[in-house]
């Protein structure tokens, strides 16, 4: 087990206390929390240009009339804040600069932070966390070779194309742009994972071969692959790390409900809108025009009013389409990040043997990396826009002891159990970071089985949990549930009122 000095815990604790995801951020930037009148909200870069609002998505900009927006709140977009935060601490000491770098890592800026980490290490070569982090960056910079993937590619049962990143090989059925976006996100996740554990003093292996992943265009092909691998237990999942192939498989959520049905409805609305446009264009100036779109009631307009009404409807359809696109990215890219953590845990030997970590810990840790905001990876241990509502809806959550003993896990995907796993790891990692690292260390230590009075896996984990966090589980459970009642996403914190 590592001592506090080896982990550099004082520096890390300074960073953690400053950066726990409370949602507070520098406000001196454009609006990034956007609340819409009819439905939905989004966290993404937005600028107001006269009567228009321009929203930035990963694949381009979307323009909307300002009147669809109920409220705008500036801030909460780390890429916009990074340069100013870095300038503010440029002349400060190593600890403060490291805290800012740690903020960047936990907010997904794992590419942007590299030069700052190297500067910190140059200023103080004895600063242990930054020394380990620059060392792992050097090792990550070494070229990777391709894995042997011919057999896996054939086993997929469909034609796929090959795309590569420095550490990722993706077999896909998508456009080059979509494949590149997915790979870029996964590369950020890989950097974040290795920087996180390097800072904490865990010496892990870095990829020597590109990590293999497959992305089906259609859910039915994903399900067919699972059946061919006798993995039907995972048929309710959107992605799966296959340990025998050492590869991730996932499918495009646009091929399945609710995305598929919602997109079909929007497409039908657009077709209706176009037909009404053509009708209005041909109508005499003084005519009265009846318009009915979708489930809306029939309304009668003059020609000028009809033109204005159709423009409003087009604006609403554009807004709905954008929100649907953001929902798709949140789930699909979040799944890709989640499964990448399982793959990295295996590749890096964080989990030396598959049964060393309980399922709740493996899934809860992977969920710390799956938050997507504005279509971009949001970083590590963020207040989870998808898991947090699931956790709040739990009617009968597992008692902490049963959860630690892995009760209910190991039978495929269970949304409620995974929400609890995310919430527990989120709490332990952010509120008890040193004990959490001790727990990880104990589980990775081969001698634990010999030291423990009982050897079955559930008891071994429970014993390690007690050593790390203490034996008063009732007190810890009360603290956990109390903490989770305070957790809010940035969008939740500012939802009330209007601007």
Task: Tell where the protein language model's regions lie, with residue ranges.
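Solvent-exposed coil/turn segments that connect beta secondary-structure elements
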Residues: 39, 47-50, 58-60, 67-74, ...
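Acidic/His/Gly-enriched intrinsically disordered linker/tail segments
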Residues: 72-77, 154-156, 232-248, 310, ...
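Compositionally biased alpha-helical segments
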Residues: 21-161, 169, 176, 184-188, ...
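Extracytoplasmic/secreted envelope proteins and their assembly/folding machinery
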Residues: 52, 98-101, 114-117, 183-190, ...
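Bacterial N-terminal signal peptides that target proteins for export
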Residues: 2-12
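Sec-exported extracytoplasmic/periplasmic mature domains
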Residues: 102-110, 118-126, 135-139, 191-202, ...
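Juxtacatalytic substrate-recognition/specificity segment
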Residues: 159-353, 358, 448, 460-461
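Bacterial N-terminal signal peptides
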Residues: 10-21
